[in-house]
């Protein structure tokens, strides 16, 4: 795809905390979720869990080291494929799209203080502080 630095630029310039997974698991060396090849169906869940283990292991590394609680994906297929994988391997980490992360981080002029994110989920007190 070639979108390697642009999503990172957006996240680094709009969100308070950004942590890269280990260098040997990102950019050109990233592990594909495999769902683009038709493995996204539920009947392939066992294969998806095994195939998603390398990415889940990289997420677990940054979760344990930095307390990461969200994986932001630029790929819509990853955004759909990773929730069941992370629920199994790293249940402390959620999945969102870069666009959603940006939308939650933006505060428009005249906007009233939000109590929910773009999904309508309640914001934790510390999350409100992090966004602002």
Enumerate the predicted regions with their spans.
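Iron-sulfur cluster-binding electron-transfer modules in prokaryotic oxidoreductases
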Residues: 1-132
């Amino acid at each position: 795809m070639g979108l390697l630095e642009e999503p990172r630029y957006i996240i680094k310039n709009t969100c308070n905390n950004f942590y890269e997974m280990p260098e040997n698991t990102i950019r050109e060396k990233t592990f594909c979720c495999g769902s683009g090849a038709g493995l996204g169906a539920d009947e392939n869940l066992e294969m998806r869990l095994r195939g998603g283990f390398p990415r889940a292991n990289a997420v677990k590394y940054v979760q344990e080291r930095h307390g990461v609680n969200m994986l932001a994906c630029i790929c819509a297929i990853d955004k759909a494929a990773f929730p069941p994988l992370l629920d199994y391997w790293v249940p402390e980490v959620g999945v969102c799209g870069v666009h959603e992360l940006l939308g939650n981080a933006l505060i428009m002029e005249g906007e009233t203080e939000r109590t929910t994110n773009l999904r309508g989920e309640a914001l934790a007190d510390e999350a409100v502080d992090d966004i602002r």
